[in-house]
Amino acid sequence: MNVNIDSEQLFTEEKPKDYAQPEVLCHTFELLSNLHKLLPNRTVEVLHSYRSEEDKRKCEKPEFSGRKILARHQLPKEINLSPKPSHVPSWKRKIINNISGNWKKCRLWQKSIYEPPMGTIIVRWTKKNLQPSEDLKSVIQRLSALGPIISVTPCGRESAVVVFRDAASACKAVSAFQTMSADSMFHCSWQHRFMSKNKTWSRRYPSKIHAEKKEKHP
């Protein structure tokens, strides 16, 4: 590669240049660009190593590019291939979706960078013809008896997001209204991902476990 650089421009002492002038700035850019072309380039060296003498002569013509030269040498296809996307089986994708679904979604309570307070629950209620109809006001009155409520966000006609001041009050609400029945026409569940996880306890030898605890802590 022939690059014309005047050595006198590099080593001759000159007065400080005013780079505010477009001509000086353009001249400096061209000089640095020419110097950059002289730096060693490993990729170009590899490309030149695959060239034959005939290729070197033809490469002077604009219709011959480096891509055509590489294609003529039949290099491995892997050098131009991007990695394939990872294929997730349908059964594994379903498990991942179920884990993500533990975060109970609400149209007005979207998942964001922060998690809801520990005392946040989702309240759902239904209406029946033979039972007094529940509404948001009556549901909040019943939940207020379990503890102080910070905020209430309606989420549809028959659901809302309720935030208690403390997690103990939320525990009472979830324990008292786990399932809908004839007496209770509304249901409470956890909004926080940690609190909504199902926890299984050992029921096989409960008496043995309690006995071991008593021995360790008399």
Swiss-Prot record:
Domain of life the protein comes from: Eukaryota
Stretches that traverse the bilayer: none
Matches recorded under InterPro entries: RBD_domain_sf, Tex56
Pfam families associated with the record: DUF4523
A GO MF term: nucleic acid binding
Protein name: Testis expressed protein 56
Source organism of the structure: Rattus norvegicus
